[in-house]
Amino acid sequence: KSKMFRLLQGDVGSGKTIVSLITALNVIDSDFQVALLAPTEILAKQHYNLAKELFPKNISIELLSSKSENIDKKRIILSLKNNKTQMVFGTHAIFQKKIIFSNLGYIIIDEQHKFGVRQRKLLSDKGGNNCDVLLMSATPIPRTLTMSVYGDMDISVIKEKPSYRKEVKTYSKLESKIDDVLSFVKKEIKEGNQIFWVCPLIEESKKIDHQSSVNKYKFLVKLFPNKVGLLHGKIDSEEKEKILNKFLNKQFSILVSTTIIEVGIDFPNANVIIIENANK
């Protein structure tokens, strides 16, 4: 059989994860192990929970990350080696030398642009020469770039979204209409919804007249005490994950962020995104 090396492209919410899990079931049914790699623990955990919900109960799956308890890590490492675990969901922890698979046949890498070629090879080597690889990305890649950078892989594109997806409504407001926007935000919070508020800069700049996330955070905290969080590139990855987890668990209603905001993570209660200086 020929080895699969495929990129699956599709917009956020188009169903890439479901497609990958269906293909994983086929591989498991053929007595091979599967590894799904995600860049953050929060995303790996969401994929793991979805699989637990969808997979038959007799399929053994595990979640492995750098934050896993040592006793759990030892158990998972042993079960992968002994072919007791059929699919593992994890972060960079899966790259470790001590992670040895009994019969790895399929690797799924979500948000593939977050991982380097060497990292992908490290994981692929754990499955031998015939290990299939599926990369997933929500980032549209121009055809010419695809041919030059990804010329050695097949490409599949999900062009349609599930029929139940509601239409996204987009509105444009002048800066002078901020009171209208705030009234709308207040109404959404009252209804139990959450809001992403995206700014192009972290801090105020004398050279560029754009909104900064820090200033917007200070402004919104006064209006919505204890309901606003802040996320930007100067925050370390561990703290960033804590903030995203708090937002996911509805500990606050508005997340002010720069464009580093994660794609792929499912925030079921966040149905509004406000983008300052959208032209940037």
Map each language-model feature to its residues.
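Inter-lobe coupling/hinge segments of SF2-like helicase ATPases
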Residues: 1-280
